[in-house]
Curated annotation (Swiss-Prot):
Record keywords: Cytoplasm, Hydrolase, Nucleotide metabolism
Keyword Ion transport: no
Any one biological process term the GO annotation gives: nucleotide metabolic process
Name recorded for this polypeptide: Nucleoside triphosphate pyrophosphatase
InterPro entries: ITPase-like_fam (IPR029001), Maf-like (IPR003697)
Amino acid sequence: MQIVLASQSPSRRKILNSAGVEPLIHPADVDEDALLHSLNGSAPEEIVRQLALAKAQVVAPSYPGDVVIGGDSMLLIDATLQGKPHTREATIERWKQQRGNKATLITGHAIIFGDEVIVESSSTNIHFAEASDVDIERYADSGEPLECAGAFTLEALGGWFIDSIEGDPSSVIGLSLPVVRRALYRLGFNASDFWNM
């Protein structure tokens, strides 16, 4: 038995690796734009939970004897939910909006084992630094934030521009170890059952 990560996120994989788990990586093929459109008007937490669930549900049938984890993160700032910026220009625009402000990073988790499905979200408050225009442009030029929810990373270059967080650091990086641990316990497993030791 193993953990299957329904994600191509290197950050989610690194979180599990640093916690002693070498997951099988099986990225989910989900039309996120269509799903987001269908969820229009839903609460932010529900949106990220449903995105995570869709990813896990696509992958789970291929691994009936394994624990499948789907995840998704989005940044809630000024009552607007933001995903990945994808472009340099969008990254710069977002950083000019979020610098010096507080936002909430919401990470949805879906953990599936057989017929059992556990869906939960985790929210962490982020206090962004007053980053300079030059640093914002250079950060965007690095390419690092283009495919990250909220246009930032906590564990790499983006860490320079985060003053503080309130909540679970692993959730900000992309996968809450406390949420996954609680789900494993509910499924009758120990976290250590999946350690590669």
